[in-house]
Amino acid sequence: MASFLHNFLLFFCSLSLIILTSSATKSQTHVPIRPNKLVLKVQKDRATNLHVVQIHKRTPLVQFPFVIDLTGRFLSVNCENQYTSSTYKAPVCHSSQCARANSHTCRTCSSSKTRPGCHTNACGLLTTNPVTQQSAQGELAEDVLKIPSTQGSSPGPMVTYPHFLFACAPSNILQKGLPKNVQGVAGLGHSPISLPYQLASHFGFPPKFAVCLTSSPGKNGAVFFGEGPYFMKPGIDVSRQLTYAPFTIGQQGEYYINVQSFKINNAMLPSIPKGGFGGAMISTTTPYTTLQTPIFRALNQLFMNQLRGVPHVKPVAPFGACFDANRIPTSKMGPTVPSIDLVLDNKKNIMWRIFGANAMIQPRPGVMCLAFVDGGMRPKAPIVIGTQQLEDNLLQFDLMNSRLGFSSSLLFRRTNCANFNFGTSSTNTDP
């Protein structure tokens, strides 16, 4: 009898321990993940030189490519191309979601059958193709979005934003000039429903994001949301040793930095307007830095004066200063040419240095050109800093303090923007 009682007690204790352990394990697997940093992989499209980010949306979950746009105010999605999701909703006009999106327009869909992007009494948003600047009214919508978390060195578990706000855009404006098969535009601009603001607000981390665009098609650059560190192989925190400068916001949510002048080999650009050139817009949808005609001509002349001993050749459009590529040696920083400094604050010696890899382009064999183009007499901004000059540089946007942190070329630190360890992110998600 004593032996039976002893065995029964052992069995009961073992069973209780198994139940408690199972319950604890189950509880742990359902603890909501509150990440302090998120990451998306971004690739350079060979045909357009635009950069495309992969985003998971809908129910059931599907991954889609979107062009990243630093001037975009929200995520614009082609909802006319078989958009199927059980969690799609169109907030009604004058709702709190519409107020958050600064939408004060009620739209009516002419179709008798409702579908994603076509609801009556929904909120209207003006959607724009960032390449062609073609615009059309779209529908404010919300749906599930999932995104990989990270501690800074590799992707972690996917986390969920169940009611992410975006715009359903007409398919005809999301085609011309954009990479094949993209499903819309990922807006990173200064707006309440842009990706950076929504993600920071939902997950509770500081409103900061960083862009690291790769120069190599087929490889992955990264867009980080949240504070650093951001590690690139071999274990380099590229968020350290940044130079900082204030930025201002344009009417459409664009980011501008003040450029006082250009400097090449310590030679300052002549004929500088009082106070400098003013706002230089940073753009991920402009392939090469675009300059107002007088600035373009002056910079080309100064660069040709400083690049001595290299024969000039006939310019290849759209570039203005081209050279015999066989006479330009290369190094880890790209073509060995004089570096170009964007002088942001001459008194404080704050400069953004552009080395050969970002300054030069080889449009055809044997020819190398200065990768700056003429924007005409009345461009959107006197200077638009394009992706050729942004690639393999880390740019961190601190939205709370209106401050830009920039690394200059990561090649100088023996790494680049394709060196984030994406590996394979976990499929585990939070609620």
Swiss-Prot record:
Q: Note the Pfam families from the entry.
A: TAXi_C, TAXi_N
One BP annotation, GO: proteolysis
Q: Where does it mainly reside?
A: secreted
Q: Which residue positions hold the site described Cleavage?
A: S271, I272, P273, K274, G275, G276
- GO cellular component entries: extracellular region
Superkingdom of source: Eukaryota
The protein's name in its UniProt record: Gamma conglutin 1
